[in-house]
From Swiss-Prot:
GO term, biological process aspect, one: cobalamin biosynthetic process
EC number: 2.4.2.21
Protein name according to UniProt: Nicotinate-nucleotide--dimethylbenzimidazole phosphoribosyltransferase
Pfam families: DBI_PRT (PF02277)
Pathway assigned in UniProt: Nucleoside biosynthesis; alpha-ribazole biosynthesis; alpha-ribazole from 5,6-dimethylbenzimidazole: step 1/2
Alphabetized UniProt keyword annotations: Cobalamin biosynthesis, Glycosyltransferase, Transferase
Enzyme class: transferase
Similarity comment text for this entry: Belongs to the CobT family.
Gene name per UniProt: cobT
Catalytic center residues: E316 (proton acceptor)
Gene Ontology molecular-function annotations: nicotinate-nucleotide-dimethylbenzimidazole phosphoribosyltransferase activity
NCBIfam families: cobT_DBIPRT, PRK00105.1
Functional summary from the UniProt entry: Catalyzes the synthesis of alpha-ribazole-5'-phosphate from nicotinate mononucleotide (NAMN) and 5,6-dimethylbenzimidazole (DMB).
Keyword Transferase: yes
Amino acid sequence: MSNDWIFGACAVPDARMRSAALARQEQLTKPPGALGRLEQLAVQLAAWQRTEHPAVQRVWIAVYAADHGVAAEGVSAFPQAVTGEMVRNFARGGAAIAVLARELGARLEVVNLGVVNDPGDLSRVRRAWIAPSTANICEQPAMTATQLRDALAAGAHSIAQAKGCDTQLFVGGEMGIGNTTAAAALGCALLSQFPQALAGAGTGLDAEGIAHKVTVITRALALHADASTPLERLRRLGGFEIAALVGAYIAAAQAGIPVLVDGFIATAAALVASRLNPGVREWLLFGHRSQERGHAALLRALDAEPLLQLDLRLGEASGAAVAIPLLRSACALHNGMATFAEAGVSDA
């Protein structure tokens, strides 16, 4: 299997349903625009879902876990063993995203793409093993071409499953010690930014730790300066879980499934996906603005206005999950409010 599928055409939102939803908003018992962005969200969901009555009840959350060779450079406040330990925590339902998924009634898929501290086969975890970790991006490309292909395909596999369940919204998350370093390096390469602009605290680095992280990213960018395409930059600087998110976002857009993007790492993947296949951008909604330093720059590059700003920086799809009730409220208001005619209320 080649990577040619990632360049395939994306679905097109339904303009007729968008117009119908806009017309309904104009007839609801409220001043025009009084519900602000909630109105826009309902209209956008109607166009995506090709219905006058959008809903966000069937939600698929996929969390991709993978380790990074660059962790050997000491770029995280936590040891690399944590990635595998968190996979086990996801499976047991103790992680933040597991709690949120239960609260939302969402389907949670956990995918083990390769971790150093491998917990082995676990119930509720899909094993899509590639390698124990990527290579150290300061020494060589993160992935081989085959590994990149497999990681992209792992994300697409999630979408195939989600589509089979008539999913109304896809949310992607990640777990991997060292992945903010990979995401920052990738963002720098794509946006021609200096590492100081995108490198942040990650799991909790102090100022000295962030300065070291900047040095590590600078070394990686120098080594891979000849990478000229988004796909090659992803292969050299990214991670298995970042590539899986890229594959999921592209496959979702091709399948016509709306995507709610999480934080810094997920947005880096969204930027790659949109550069590889520009049609993807039309299917992306952004859940929150992370506290991670580089997230704002990535959002600007995507012309994205996130729904929330709560100073979150956990990852796991947790910030996006917190935004889902907003989407549900938008749909409930759109579908449930009376029109002026139904309520016998005078229009303006």
